Amino acid sequence: MTERTPVEATNIDGYGSPEFPWKDVRDQLAAPVGVEKAAYLGTVRPDGRPHSAGIGPVWFDGDFYITGSLNSRKIKNLMANPNATLSIRLPGFDVTLEGTVSQVDDPDTLTQVAALYRQDGWPAEVAGDALTAPYSAQTAGPPPWHLFRFRFSKVIALRLSESGGAMRWRFDS
């Protein structure tokens, strides 16, 4: 996989603010998440009720990657329905991504994503087809934590500067 480019860009601002390029948002999305950026994964329970979980995603090769225990609510939801949203507050932007999530067990991807997590401060290591570390989020449960790719098909970004603006980009799945 490689970085993806939008197949459609639409200015959805209702106040006449100018368009802004995908690159501005993409560069912020690809930066290490860290603690100063809040990210939330939205899923749907099998009975239709919504679920939201704070997560620590990393950007790799044009997609986001997340981890989770197979026993966690978010992963159980994704196994039943892979559609999800990812909402992130970035410096200068509020961004919501819509897409699908799939489990990753490719050793090369696991190794590369674990290295990105280590660069971001979480000491993740590959253990079989999942990741492990001395610690994780308080609600993560015990290791191992499996890796999942969030492949987005739509991105909506609100620019938070004085000039404002709102854009929607669509991507091939």
Task: Please annotate each region the language model reported.
Residues 37-38, 83, 122, 155:
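Generic structural signal for secondary-structure transition and capping sites
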Residues 70-71, 161:
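Secondary-structure transition/turn motif
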Residues 36-70, 76-78, 84-89, 96-100:
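Short beta-strand segments
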Residues 30-31, 56, 76, 138-140:
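Short secondary-structure boundary/capping segments
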Residues 1-21, 93-173:
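Charged, gly/pro-rich active-site loop segments
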Residues 72-73, 108:
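A generic structural signal for alpha-helix starts
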Residues 79-84, 115, 119:
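Short, intrinsically disordered, mixed-charge
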Residues 12-39:
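Short, basic/aromatic recognition patches
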